[in-house]
Structures are given as C-alpha cells and as structure tokens.
C-alpha cells in the first residue's frame, strides 16, 4: 500500500500547478461606469507567456496557474489586466492610464470562451413575432438565437404598426421584428444578411400626397400647402401592380409596378451609444430606405455587440429613389433571410450587394456628408478587395433625419480584376 500512496503524494503538487488552457477566442466585457464594453479577446500561449489581441490592440502577458496578467497599449492609452481564469471564464480588474492626462481609471472585467460552431447542417427557423420594437437597442432581449448559415422566415408590420390583417399591433414609427442573436458574432465581425425572399402578405398599402421639406423650394411649398393627406393603394399581388383606391380623374388609369423592399435592416449600435429610434439610420444600418434592399440582395453590417442583434422591418411594396413624399407604399411583409458571418472584417458604412452591383451606403445629416460617406465607403471596399475607383452615384434617402447616398459600381466592370483578398466566411 505504501507505493501507491507515495505515487499520489508526488504528482498531486504537479496537478495543482498545471496551467489553465486559455488559448483561443474569448468575449471580454469591461464594465466602464456601468457601460459594458464588449471586445474580442484572442490569446496565444507559449509556456507561461501570453500574446494576442484585445479588440484592435495587441497584448502581452503571463499566465501563472489560475492567475492571468496582460497589458494592452495604443497611441491613446495603456491598460493592465489582472484576474483569475478557468477553462471557460475569467474575472478580474483593469487599470487604464490615459496617455495624455495620465489619469487612472479602475474597472472590472469578465470574459467567456466563445463556443464552437454547433454540429449538423444549417437550420431553417419559422418565427412568429408577438412584440415589435421601436429602437435598435442592445438591451432588448433577443427573440431568437440563430447560427451563421441559418435561415429565418418571419413577418413584419408596416410603418404604422399594422400587420397583414390590418390589426394595429404597436405604435407607428417603423416598428421592427427582432432582435435576432447570431451565435459566435463578435464586435469587429461583419454580418451578411442575404435577403432570400420578400413577399407581400396583404392587398393594400398606405402613402402620402406631399413632398418632404428637404426637397421643396418656396414656390413648390406654396403649391403643396393643402397636401399632407394619406393615400391608400390597392396591391394586385398577381400582376404585381398598384392603383390608388380613390384616384383623382388624372390618376384613374395610373398604375405603379411593385418591387418589394425592406426599409430597415439594422444591428444594435456600439459601446456607450444611445439606442437610436427606428426612424434613424447610421453605420449600424437601420432605416436606410434604400430601394436596392430587395429579394436577392445582401446587406453587410458591422457587428458592434455580441450576437449582432439584427432587426428587420419597414416593408415597402415599392419605393422610388429618395422616398420624396415621406413614405413609400408602406405595407406588412413576409420576410426570409439567411445569415453569414465574416470574422474580423471592418467596414465604416453599410454595404449592399446585388447580383449585378456592389453598393456603399452613405448616411449623414446632409446630402454632402452622405455623399462623402458613400464615396469613402466604396473606396474602402475597392481598396480592400479590388483597388479600383468608384463610378456611379444614386441618392437613396432624403425623407428622414439622415440623408442617404448610395455609390453603385457594376460588377461586370470588376470581372477582369482578381480579388485582392478573399473574404473568409465562417464555416456553416
């Protein structure tokens, strides 16, 4: 009996000193005055030495049993992290020193290991919404958890909150379906939302008879003084045309071809940002009101919160360039989309891709600012993938708080040029 006892006495200290395996990808969350800052944490281990990245910053540190210590530095600040770690979680403190003022800020942090892709093929989800939201908020509880490669079929209410039966379910203002939580999506990733199908699910839509002030000079404003009334349209879903229910004599034979689109596709905004209303737009997407977001297109959005938190809504039976009368043909919609994820790819402004074009969406309080954002966004895209210069510009949005400009480039002009870098999508 003495030999087995001696054996255990020898190896027990070695087990107690074993290093925790921390290599891999983590989601780190720092509590900064009650505001959670979420970042991708990537760790590499060589003995007791750590290296890797936290967000965009390189890190160096050490691992001592269950103790972890690392430091990050950039041009503006340095941060020192100390904590304890298990195989799948971390807790600790962080001290940040401002590079200019030398002010010290104390905070706490936690981290959890990012799970692996689940086994099996992508899934299709049927989601029936019961609640709709009027902000692109990171604090709203996700309605459904999905994985890259999954497809979701759902419905949206119209801009006034009415569903396919005409029942008002929520206050107006572009109420959204969602948010959908995408597993393994981390800040710094790129979310690809493939619009598989957009189907009209009722036979009427609402619009207006006026023109938005941004597009009106003083002479036209006088002529429009008696406008501002709602106009109802009949949607012929067989012939895919629309007619006014009560047209004037001049418009009695007027028809509009239908091209269903989504006015809103957005994700939750980033750290310390107030949740924007669903009438707003920005780098997170949102109420872009771009008539190129149709069946067969793909919307690319920067992930800024864990899980991305995707919202969709504001279906239009058809919309012209600019939504000049404040509303398109507003209606409810059946929506089907598939999610992909491109890890660690940064874009400054939303992108839309069709079978024939790549399009950078610029959004700003002025048309000039939106034009600059679209040009910069396209230049970034072409620099990343093609190293070419932009060509065509289309104004997509003037009705809301932010104007929008879409810079569009035909794909056939890019065919002779090889991609500078191949985008890697997360395995499905």
Language model regions located:
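Central antiparallel beta-sheet cores of small beta-barrel/beta-sandwich binding domains
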Residues: 19-105
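N-terminal, Lys/Arg-enriched amphipathic/low-complexity engagement segments
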Residues: 120-168
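Short, structured beta-strand/loop micro-motifs enriched in basic residues and often containing a Trp
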Residues: 128-137, 169-176, 276-284
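Short, Lys/Arg- and Gly-enriched loop/turn segments at beta-strand edges
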Residues: 159-170, 198-208, 307-317
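Intrinsically disordered, low-complexity linker/loop segments enriched in Gly/Pro
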Residues: 197-293
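Conserved mixed alpha/beta catalytic, RNA-binding, or beta-rich assembly cores of soluble enzyme
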Residues: 258-287, 291-368, 379
